[in-house]
Amino acid sequence: MENLEQLQERVAVSDGRAKADLVIKNGRIINVFSGEIMDGDIAIKNGYIAGIGNFPDAEKIIDAAGAFIAPGFIDAHVHVESAMVTPAEFARVLLPNGVTTIVTDPHEIANVAGEKGIEFMLEDAKGVPIDMFVMLPSSVPATEGEHNGETLHAEKLHPLYRHEKVIGLAEVMDFPSVAKGSSDILTKIIDAKKEGGRIDGHGAGLTSADLNNYLAVGIRTDHESTTAKEATDRLRAGMFVMLREGTVGRDLLQTIPAVSEKNSHRFCFCTDDKLINDLITEGSINYNIRLAIKNGIDPITAIQMATINAANCHNLPYLGAVAAGYQADIVFLTDIETVEISKVLKNGEVVVDNGVRHEAAFKQQAAVPFVSPPINHHVSLQDLALPLTKETCYVIGMQPNSLFTEKRIEQVAIQDGKFVPTVENDLLKMAVVERHHDTGCVGLGIVKGFGLTEGAIATTVAHDSHNIVAVGISDEAMKAAIDHITQTGGGIAVVNGAGQVLHDLALPIAGLLSDKSYEEVENDLAGLLNAFKQISTADGFDPFLTLSFLTLPVIPELKLTDQGLFDFATFQIISNEVN
């Protein structure tokens, strides 16, 4: 927050009575308000833009040499935990991609560690040259009846609004509770309104009629559109629509046709969940911009969606524009069509130059201490047996690069009254093992799409309750993978048919985050993918994040929790057998 002296200094620079800290000359300024490209010097004082015009003198001058000057990009909705690195490491990845602000929902770590998890994320982001705004998790757990690590009722969330980086209530996923007027979720919404915060939606699978419930209680955004029609329905209802392009949720190409010249001001971009290897190879919001431009969106419109629209969506009045009074978060683009980034400024300081981070901009701070709750279960081979009396069963049909699944009906193999996975039909066993309270709960189901020929994979990243999820050919291989990630304090493992670990990634922070650099995490993810290729014929999707979302019951159609097979249409646990 600025003080009186800083504001007076900025005014003095704006009218020419004092020198700017920095002036950027010879840039082509993208005006996100008018849609024009303008000329002019950009004068910066104390991290804010003092004015645009003729500013001949400054402590430092940068010659933009004809580069386009855009505001810093904003990711309107992201879960940092999906990158499996700490917020400080996450910032190191994002800044070269022009992302200077993120709006995050830390509900992954909150599901494991409650308020302490949220506080850890806020503390770790201190001193990092990126703005990490937090929307408080609304649905921990995501649905009633799941066993997660902690439950966050309204009275636990409310004190967290005192933190300056907390700006609202995150995606309201439990739609049935909204529809029936549950006092806990409505109290959370009222508290957010009292604090002046936005309320995010999570309208996966909702019809235009269902949206009335959302709008009636004050939910104003949504990032779950997977078609242009869904995006249009949300737009017409009065929502800001975030177009998502992540690792699994790749929806931008299907939703971008909804954007027009008349309505583009109500659209912005998000990644939601994106792995570190995809952030490195593709990018972040810069990738969304590039993809939108390739598919017919005007470059300036795409940049507006990534900047001022996102700022307006979240009521961040000093972000999202290159204009007087705005924070000096600036991206230099050598090519507006391909979004080639040459330089990034955060609060008026150069943090990236010619694609290289200025590591000095990252204040060296000691690792934030975090005591992870123990992984607590006692699963046995007997617990992994799936008894069946009928060969006709419901099967979770995994859909590559989608958060949705298909509710399939298949004929499955049975031996001695138990389900037997079959390689030729790609019908595999899936298990969710409760890991927080040693309840002994194990949900079992059948999944199609992973193409395993031997072995198993397992992970403690299992949205949103983050129990252990495994898929495999044999119970022995599944148990070997589960046992390994239990011993390492959480993580991901690939094992072969003999139960030998081919590769793993330890995630000691809540079973969700690594304590290593993002470069080391990227190397381990590459090792995991190579190991997966040794035991599977499937390709073209990330198997680990895909598996992690097969446990999220608030997205259609069929998911698996520690309670059993969950049918989104009825919002109930159902039998594996078709009656």
From Swiss-Prot:
Gene3D superfamilies from the UniProt entry: Metal-dependent hydrolases, Urease, subunit C, domain 1
EC primary class: hydrolase
GO molecular function, one term: adenine deaminase activity
Requisite cofactors: Mn(2+)
Entry EC no(s): 3.5.4.2
InterPro entries: Adenine_deam, Adenine_deam_C, Amidohydro-rel, Metal-dep_hydrolase_composite, Metal_Hydrolase
Entry-linked SUPFAM superfamilies: Composite domain of metallo-dependent hydrolases, Metallo-dependent hydrolases
Catalytic activity annotation: adenine + H2O + H(+) = hypoxanthine + NH4(+)
Family from the record: Belongs to the metallo-dependent hydrolases superfamily. Adenine deaminase family.
PANTHER family: ADENINE DEAMINASE, N-ACETYLGLUCOSAMINE-6-PHOSPHATE DEACETYLASE
The name this protein goes by in its record: Adenine deaminase
Natural source organism: Listeria monocytogenes serotype 4b (strain F2365)
Lineage: Bacteria, Bacillati, Bacillota, Bacilli, Bacillales
